[in-house]
Amino acid sequence: MAKFEIKKIINRLVENLSDRSRDVILSRFGIGKDDYETLEAIGQRYGITRERVRQIEADALRHIKNPANEPVIRPVVNALNEFVKSRGGVMEESALKADFAVNHFEVKPEPSKKYEGAAMFFLHLAGNFIRTKEDDNFWPRWALDAASLKNQEGLVNYLIGQFKKEKKAVSLDEFMGWAKKYNPAPNPDAVSASLASAKNVAKNSFNEWGLISWAEISPRGVRDKAYLVMKRLQKPLHFTEVAAEINKAAFSPRVALPQTVHNELIK
């Protein structure tokens, strides 16, 4: 798997930009930073309008896309294409940039998270990806083509239909069994990418998958959490043991207190 010295590559691509244009590009994509900056934040720093920042960004990207930079850009874009293709041709945005940075960027000793924005930068330079906005059913996604989007949406809709039919949370193995009914030879990475893209499907602390609206998947209070741990262990438990099991499952950072569990169980 190719590992790119991404800091050197980025420096090469922005070295001929003006100081302001370089800063706008690095700030907008959050390259080497903890997060990206908005048009408004950059505009306030320079005393210019959001639209002017947008123009500077667009001009800088056009300059970077100069054919002379193609030998520098193309290897990373090719790796992006293959990476997304191996996951069914479409990935949720945050998973794509995080996973690609971990697998393909050499940035030590810095954390790869600081260079997730570089993946977004190259997605924009590639020019062949389709980006879909967040909607009621999916998070923002990047796809190689419309057919990949259609395939993912078909799989997700089928799996949601299975959940509504079976009315239960299932293990990943059982989930993959459903996927095989939709496609006899499913790509496990594509199925995982589909799950990451879907807003209405999630897994609980016991790695069981289901609809995010279900209490078994998104327990909302101590009573739901107590039900889940007792269902899983299938044996009588003292309320102090229930509290301990809830905390062990780490449903949330909030600690379950034995007295709270007791009060919920006797309601």
State the predicted function of each range:
Residues 1-267:
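C-terminal non-catalytic scaffold/interaction domains in large multidomain proteins
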